[in-house]
Amino acid sequence: MHQVIELQGVAKRYDSAGAPALGPLTLGVAEGEALVVTGPSGSGKSTLLNLVAGLDRPTDGAVIVAGRRIDQLSEHALAKFRREHIGMVFQFFNLLDDLTVTDNIQLPAQLTGTGRREAAARAGELMEMLGIRRHARAYPGRLSGGERQRVAVARALVNRPALLLADEPTGALDTASGHDVRDLLVDLHRAGQTVVLVTHDPALAEACASRTIHLVDGHVALDTYAQAVR
């Protein structure tokens, strides 16, 4: 099966004299997988996600996403690649409060050169799919946490990315909103979206994972399929 992510001997050191924060690590993620990354604080989860997202560069090794070795791209090329191929969802939404829901969602498409009409059509399609069309002209500050996270997911998907990265997407939500976002991630995976999810929430991990890796001190301590670490 096609590999969306390939990490080849990847290590990241923040202190040249200390142990790596991550790795060395060799890991592949196949198209359509929902990979959940768990582990204690400081285990390397955020470092792994940042390397895959191209938000940081490895000290050693190769990071290949959607067939491109992103650790060797220039900053300009990397930013363009990220906009086109990687969608990201964070704990605190990162929406622009002075833009409407529709404008927030279609902005990444416009940044990649998509025409306004086509971007608006894609935003409308996603709002319908995610159950937020009634909020099209609203501003994010008027929405609940769960609704804002749905807007963030729609924005992440607007360019039809090969990969969706989610970092503690329910961490700032109440229980009901968290369940809504969990169900949304499950539905996206069932529709074939490749997902990498970092979470401390065992229930979220169990619901979403087709595969789970558990990190300890920057290394994979456990790699399991069709079940989550509890």
Segments the model singles out, each with a brief description of its role:
Residues 77, 219, 227:
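Residue-level detector of flexible, active-site-proximal loop/helix-junction positions
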